Amino acid sequence: MIPYSAPIQDMRFVLNEVVGMDRITSLPGYADATPDMVDAILDEAGKLASNVLAPINFSGDQEGAVLENGVVRTPKGFREAYRQYQEGGWNSVPFDPEHGGQGLPWTLAMAVQEMWQAANMSFALCPMLNQGAVEALTEHGSDALKEIYLGKLISGEWTGTMNLTEPQAGSDLAAIRTRAVREDGHYRISGQKIYITYGEHDFTENIIHMVLARLNDAPPGIKGISLFVVPKFLVNPDGSLGERNDLRCVSLEHKLGIHASPTAVMAFGDNDGAIGYLVGEENRGIEYMFTMMNNARMGVGLQGVAISERAYQQARDYARTRVQSRDMTDAKGEPVSIVRHPDVRRMLMTMRAQTEAARALTYYAVAALDVAKKHADPAEAAKGQAMADLLTPVVKAWCTDLGVENASTGIQIHGGMGFIEETGAAQHLRDARITPIYEGTNGIQANDLVFRKVIRDGGAAAGNLFAEMRETVEALKHLPGDDMAAISIALGKAVDALEKATAWLVEHGKRMPQAAAAGAANYLRMFGITTGGFLMARAAMAALQGQADPDADQRFLDAKLITARFFADQFLPQAASLLTPITEGHRTVMALSEDQF
C-alpha cells in the first residue's frame, strides 16, 4: 500500500488565513459551518481518504474496471468504499438542504474533495461528475424533475453522468448528432456517446444520464442543442424503479491511466429510443451544460492539486529513505539519503511550492463562487461571480499542467525505480495526464480566459484582481525581513508583466484574434504563476504574523515562509519572461504553411 496523509494543517491554513473562511461562513445560509464543524469535517474526511480510499488506489489501477455481459464491475473494494462514502453523507456536503443536502460552503466541500481525488482519483471521478448533474438539475430542472431525481442524486443513492462527446463531436459540440424526438410527456433519445465517466458501474442501482441531443426541427449549430435526463431505469410515480431504459454500455475504453474509473461508450435507443426528460427549455442545452462543465472544470483543476500532493508525498518519503552517494560537504562521509542532495531538494521544493500555490488558487476561486451564490448584496454577488468566472479556466488549466509536471518530477526523484510500475510513482503521471484534456482542453481554457473572461469585459474583472495584488505588494513593503521585501519585488514585477499582457490583449485581441489565440496558453500560464504568487505572498504574511504567537506551530509557519520565498525566487520571474511570447509570438506561431509541417 502506498500511503496518503491528508495535508489537513495546510488546508486549514489556506482556508483560514489565505481565503478567509470566516468571511465565507458569515454569508447567509452558512452559519452552521462553525470552526469546530469545519475542523471535524476535515478530520473525518481525512480518515476516509487515508484509511479507505488510498489503500485501494494502486490495486484498483492494476485490476481496472471490466465489462462482463453488459455489466461493469469495478475493482475489488471500490463498491464497499462507495457504500461507506455514501452512508457517511459525504456526497451531500454542499447541496441544498431542501433536497437532503447539508448546505455547507463549496469552499469546504472542495477541500474535502481534494482528499478524495488525492487518495483515489479513479474513485473520486464518480462523485465529481454526479456533482455536476446535481448542479444542472438544481439550476435548470423543473420542480417535477427535482422531486424525482435530486434527493437521491444528492444522497448518492443514485449517481449522475455527463453525456456530451460523440465520435465526431469532441471539443466542437455543434457537431452533435444524437437525436431527440418529442413524444407524449417525454422524448425519445437515440445516438452514441463516448468517453462517459462512470457511464455504467456497480455502485448504485440507478444511473442518471445528462444527455445533449438535437431535435429534428432545431436550429443548426450549438443553438439547436437540448439537455435531457435519461435514467438507466425509469422511475415509477411512487419513486420505485421501473423497467430498464433503452440504453446500454457498448464497451469500456482501454486508457493510459485512471484504470479503475469505467470510461464507457454508451448507446441510446437501439430499439424504440431511450426515454428522456427535457431539462429547462428546448435548444438551451449548451447554456445548461456549462453549469455542469464549469463545476467539472473546477473539480478537474482540483485533481491537479490532488495528484501533485500525492506525488509529492510519495517522492518526499522515497527521498528520505533512499540512500545514495555522499553529502557534497563531506567527501569522506558515509552515503546519505538523497533528500540531502541539492538537486533533489530543488525538485521537492518545486513540487511543494507549486502544489501549495495551486491549492490556494483553487480554494480562492471556489470562495468567490460561494460569495456569488450567497452574498446578500447583489453587487457583491456579481463581483464574486465575475471572479469565479475569471479564475475557472486558470484553475482548470494551470493546476492540471502543474499536476502533470509534478507527477513527472516525482518519477525523476525516484530515479529508475520511478519507471517501475510496482513503485506506484508512474500511476500518478498516468492518472494526471488526462486532466489537461478532459472537460475542455487546456488550450480551450486559455482561449476562454483571453476572449470570454478578459477581452469581453475590457479587462474589468481582471483589473479587480490586479488591484488586490497591488495592495499585497504594498503591504509586503511595510513588513520586516528580507523575505517580505524579496517577495514584494518579485510579485510587483510579475503583476507589471501581467497588466501589460492584459492591456495588449484588450487592445489587439478583437482585431487580431489569431495573434491573441497564439499567445493564450502563455497568458494563462502567466496568469496562474502571478495569481499563485499573490496567494503565496498572502500566506507568507499570515505566517509572519502567526509567528508572534508563542503557542503556534513555528516549524510549520517557518516552512510556509520559506516555501513562499522559494516560489517568489523560482517562479514569479517566469511571468515577465512570458510577455514577449504573448505579444510577439504569433509572428512565428502562424508563419509556416500547412505543408511545411
Across the structure, where does each feature detected by a protein language model lie?
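Acidic, low-complexity proline/glycine-rich segments
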Residues: M1-T25, A274-N283, Q314, R320-T321, ...
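A short core secondary-structure module
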Residues: H186, S190-R244
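Internal maturation/activation junctions in enzymes
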Residues: A65, F78, L129-N130, G141-T178, ...
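Alpha-helix capping/hinge segments and adjacent helical runs
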Residues: I2-S5, R182, I258, Y364, ...
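C-terminal amphipathic alpha-helical interaction region
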Residues: H99, R456, T472-F597
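Glycine-rich cofactor-pocket loops
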Residues: G29-D32, Q62-T74, R284-G299, Q313-R352, ...
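A glycine-rich, basic-preceded beta-loop-alpha segment at the flavin cofactor/substrate interface
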Residues: Y195-T197, L234-V250, K255, P262-A296, ...
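Amphipathic, small/basic residue-rich leader segments at the start of a protein or domain
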Residues: M1-A124, I148, D370, T580-P581, ...
